[in-house]
Amino acid sequence: MKEIKAIIRPFKLLDVTEALQKIKGLPGVTVSEIKGFGKSRAKNAKDKVTYELVEFIPRIKLEVVVADEMADEVVNIIQRYSHTGNTGDGKIFVINVEEVVKIRTNERGKEAV
């Protein structure tokens, strides 16, 4: 199984989620509103940046756990529908998942997703 985490622009959320909902068997997606900054922001920072001076940019984090064979399709859809070509489009992380346990039923593995 794979956990896919994506950091995207907020205005791309609807496009991405509409496309993801068309994937047969997609177990679901968790969406969080987050803030942060990337390399380009950090490169422009002065040597000493106080916490108050850092501008955090609003972003959306998508998280989904899928079977290995579904991971490429999910990644490709997120990349395709969140891409603008501009700095700050975001990142997609793919992480191996050793185990999943569904709390309500104690199911494990793929069945728990």
Say what each PLM segment does.
Residues 1-113:
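Positively charged, small/polar-rich N-terminal and surface patches that mediate targeting and assembly
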